[in-house]
Amino acid sequence: MQRKPRKNLTRPRKKTAKTRNLRRDGKQLKSNLETYCYDQLKEFDIDFVYEGETFIIQDGFRYPGIYYKSTKGKDFMMNATGNAVLQVKYTPDFVSHKDKFIIETKGYVPSQHTFPIRWKMFLKYLVDNGMDDYMLFIPKNKKQVDETIQTICRELKKSK
């Protein structure tokens, strides 16, 4: 009795989108979605800066107590007592202080495990620093970028 060939039980890997020319106005953009958003903001003559500002959402510090941490690829823990804990920074994709908006494009990113907590910390930073009147957008595709641009244009017309 012959056996049937086994099916491949592993999932096929999703292919990431091929990147084309991602250079605009001398700036190297990181994804097709960022490029599309950049082009749309320019087309609608909306004032913005691309990755022009980095926010420090938590200052660095030194932990005064005993601190051991695991080491990559080794079986033992390393003594990190007294070592500096680095600051936590966040750089949004598009910022406009004039029009009060921040856009963070998030396409298909398989392992952005730090983004959700970093984003929550950033929201707290905005509230604590009197920037809670900014419009925030996290579009994941071109349709959502279009919706983002429409919302910004609509809000700018209201304020004039």
Predicted regions and their residues:
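Electrostatic, structured charged patches in enzyme active sites and in nucleic-acid/phosphate-binding
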Residues: M1-K160
